[in-house]
């Protein structure tokens, strides 16, 4: 039976199989954890916290996908695949998907609607992703 990853691979589909790369995995993890730490910096505006935390989440989720040996052609799929990459449920990936939508509305339509509640939820989701990614053994070089 094909995996959820295999079902999303192929021409016109959002994933492609690609062997994991230890340096890439470690770099994505380091970048994600640094951005997550920076998102909690004192004196940051909500929009800066959101931007840092969203990009931290994306880097960490992408690291998990790369660990499984796949590359994504779009940002959203790394959040949708969290049940398969890190065994995280909808309470996490739905927050990240909402943040992706908020980010896109801001980037492409100039309508950035960030609330303190959204940033708190995003940081909590990032913490769960970070804990799971940090528990992964880096792929062999």
Description of each model-found segment:
Residues 1-141:
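Terminal alpha-helical segments
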């Amino acid at each position: 039976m094909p995996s959820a990853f295999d079902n999303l691979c192929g021409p016109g589909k959002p994933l492609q199989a690609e062997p994991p790369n230890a340096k890439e995995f470690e770099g994505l993890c380091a970048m994600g954890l640094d951005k997550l730490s920076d998102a909690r910096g004192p004196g940051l505006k909500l929009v800066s916290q959101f931007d840092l935390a969203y990009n931290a989440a994306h880097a960490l989720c992408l690291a998990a996908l790369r660990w499984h040996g796949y590359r994504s052609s779009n940002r959203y799929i790394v959040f949708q695949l969290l049940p398969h990459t890190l065994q995280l449920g909808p309470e996490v990936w739905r927050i990240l998907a909402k943040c992706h939508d908020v980010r896109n509305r801001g980037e492409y339509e100039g309508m950035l609607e960030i609330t303190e509640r959204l940033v708190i939820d995003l940081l909590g989701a990032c913490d769960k992703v970070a804990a799971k990614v940090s528990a992964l053994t880096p792929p062999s070089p």
